[in-house]
A protein has these predicted regions:
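N-terminal signal-anchor transmembrane alpha helix
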Residues: 2-26
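Helix-coil boundary and interhelical linker segments in multi-pass alpha-helical membrane proteins
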Residues: 1-6, 65-81, 112-119
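Cytosolic, membrane-interface loops and tails of multi-pass inner-membrane proteins
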Residues: 20-53, 100
């Protein structure tokens, strides 16, 4: 029962669509009709509002950090259940008919909670790749590959 509760709460926290909510409340626009149609921070930046873009990034990271750190210090053996559930909540949010973001910011929050070194490896790899390629999506994919290599 404990596993189901942790998975459900983590999923629900992960499914909070901050990019959608912030652009709807502050810009009166539906982020799903802008740029790539994705609700994540990269697409929110395409609205031209950097504050909302970086707020989305911060909140998408935070929505992973809060439940995972709680689980890490109270139910250590269930941390990966919480991490997977938060990630799935972001990618498949019940509130938006299971069409969410790509999960990159949420993944960063997960990495920092599980092992902060992995979080830094991802961030540094992402920045280096982005400086060369100028593509956020490519940077995210290749930086993710750096994690198992490390």
């Amino acid at each position: 029962m404990e596993i189901i509760f942790i998975a459900l709460v983590s999923y629900l926290l992960g499914s909070i669509p901050f990019g959608f909510l912030l652009t709807k409340l502050l810009l009166k626009q539906d982020i799903r009709n802008i740029g790539s149609g994705n609700i994540g921070a990269t697409n929110v930046l395409r609205t031209g509002n950097k504050l909302i873009g970086f707020s989305t990034l911060f909140l998408d990271i935070l929505k992973a950090v809060i439940p995972i750190l709680f689980i890490k210090y109270n139910f250590q053996n269930l941390i990966f259940i919480s991490a997977l559930s938060v990630f799935l909540g972001h990618v498949f949010p019940i509130w938006l008919k299971f069409k969410g973001g790509k999960g990159v910011a949420t993944y960063v929050g997960i990495l920092f909670c599980i092992n902060y070194i992995l979080g830094f490896v991802f961030i540094i790899s992402w920045f280096i790749i982005f400086l060369v390629s100028k593509y956020s999506s490519l940077s995210s994919l290749l930086a993710s590959l750096a994690i198992p290599i490390y």
